[in-house]
Amino acid sequence: MLLVTATACVPVPGQDVPDVRTPLAVVNEMLRLADVTASDVVYDLGSGDGRILIAAARDRGARGVGLEIDPALVAQSAERARRLGLADRLSFRQQDLFEADLTPATVVTLYLSSDLNRRLQPKLLSELRPGARIVSHSFDMGDWAPARTLQVSSNEGSHTLYLWVVPGR
C-alpha cells in the first residue's frame, strides 16, 4: 500500500532549494556509504523525484519516506513507486521537513544546502536515535565533523558525500 499524504506547506524564504537531481551513480554511493539494508527506514528530506528511496527499496530492500514540498514531485514519485511495485515499501509526503517527525528514520539522506543542513542539525540530533546515519550530497553541517567523506565521480562531475552517525545521548 502506498501512502501519499498532503500537509499544508508554507515555504519560508530561504528554505526552498532548486530541484536538482542526484545522479544515479551518486545515489548508489550514498546508499553504500550509509550501509543501507533491508532493516532500514530511509527518510529522504527534499525527495524530489524519489530516486534515492526507489533505489533504497529496489536494490537494498529498505523502506522509505520521502518529504517534499512540491506536490507535483510527490505525485510523480508515488506513481513511479507504484509502477515499479514498491508502493508497499515507500511513502511520499508533501510536508515541510522542519515539521516532520523523523523519529522512525534509521537513515536520512539530504541534498539541500549548507544553510539548511546546519539548521536541520538540532532536529536531527534530537529526533534520530543513536547510531542513525545521515548522508548529505555536496553540503556539510558546519562544525559537526562528518564520520566520513567520499569523493564520487559521475557524468555530471565530482561530488562530495558526507556521512554522520548520531552519537549516543
Q: What residues fall within each predicted segment?
A:
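S-adenosyl-L-methionine
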Residues: 6-40, 74-104
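Conserved class I S-adenosyl-L-methionine
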Residues: 39-48
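Conserved SAM-binding motif I beta-strand of class I
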Residues: 63-68
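A short SAM/SAH-binding and catalytic strip from SAM-dependent methyltransferases
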Residues: 103-119
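C-terminal substrate-binding/active-site "lid" region of AdoMet-derived donor-dependent transferases
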Residues: 115-169
